[in-house]
């Protein structure tokens, strides 16, 4: 039986600075990425995550700020 792998999930502010971290255990990298994304979803005051397995960065993800929709219109006669 194999052991679960330990990961550290860092939570980033709007400038990309680390503001918090949490250890998680998962069977493989993809499970850890999904877990970290779920954690970020429930922590709306953070803007991104970095997921590390020891000295190897597994994943980095940053939320884009909400931008109002806009329309680009072509000028007539071009």
Regions found by a protein language model. Give the residues of each.
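Short aromatic-glycine-(Arg/Gly/Cys) micro-motifs in beta-strand/loop hairpins
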Residues: 1-19
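A short, exposed loop/beta-hairpin motif centered on an aromatic-Gly-Thr core
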Residues: 17-28
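Short acidic, gly/pro-rich beta-turn/loop elements at beta-sheet edges
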Residues: 19, 34, 59-61
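A short, charged, amphipathic alpha-helix used as a generic interaction element across diverse proteins
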Residues: 27-48
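Short, mixed-charge low-complexity intrinsically disordered segments
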Residues: 41-78
